[in-house]
Amino acid sequence: MGKMNESKKIIFVDNLTSINEIENFSNQSNVKIISFDYTSHIKLTEKNIEHEISEIYLTQDTKKLQKQCYEFLNWHDLDIIKKNTSFLNVNISRLCNDQLIHKIIKILKNFSEIKVVVKQFPNLEYFASGDLLLISKLWIKSINEIPNSQKMKFYFDNIEIGINIGKKNIKISIPNSLYKKIKNIIEKVLESILQNENLSKKNTLLVEFNTKKFKKFFLESKNYNKNIAYYGRRRPGIWDLESFKIIKNSQCKIITSNIMKGDILKTYKKNILEIKEKYLELLNSNKELNRFFSIDDISIISVISPIIKLLIIDRLEEIIFEILLAKQMFEGVHIDSVVVLSEIGMTEQIIIQLANQKKIPILHLQ
């Protein structure tokens, strides 16, 4: 902390900040660098760049931060959101909480830390990028921008796949778009092998289950004369020989995107455009939303808005497709009950909201 008092410049760094830019500052004696996450801390350490970690400025109780985070996650319950950004009575803003929660926690933590730093050292020159720049602008009138080295990513942008080679398990990361293409091809092949039947009979829908982890649950369903159908948009029902045998022996039906009839998205292009415009209008100028996303009477909507734009608005076609697919599934498959493991994922939320509309009972298995 002693060197901080001698510094004239403070640089905020996170995992998106260009470390090459930071190297230009590192040899200056009047500069203090603060890392705001583990990834940037490791990168700076590998480059032998002296820095502090932001946690030493975290004075707020983490439980309070978590409480604030969960309050912000309820933004989808605002009447103005439900009224203007729903599709087929599905609350779109509620579908992305599993991704949004990580971003909001990080924003709240960084907000608390930056607040302490700026109040402690008010007259220094500050440098930041990305979210750190937007948060800093809430406290600092003039701040210098550092370029980001990469774009913001979300948890499900990449999918990690484990491949067994001999006795070794090698994990590779692939884009979600590529994963879905591979998954669709495999499911088409498996669909022809398994030949889904009896979808017109009553089925219990299992949503995003791990087939091998719930092997007993799948296999014993036959003993209760109960038809089961699997619906997984993130997780495949079959990915190796063991999971294939479980699905086959349990006579479980795999429901895939092949139930979608034609390019149905074209029918809803106008709806999609209208919802996008409503989101942008609300994020840019709605006073109620400004007040809702506030900490100590300071609105952080300027920090939250870019995340919502990337997470929801830019992916709206994909989200609408998932809603339409689930709707068509309920229309084409006789579902009399639904079982979920979680209520926070997008697939689970879509199924829960549509099932509630149809008064289909939902069991949350823990």
Each language-model region and where it sits:
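Catalytic-core helical/loop segments in enzymes performing group transfer/polymerization on anionic/lipid-linked
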Residues: 1-366
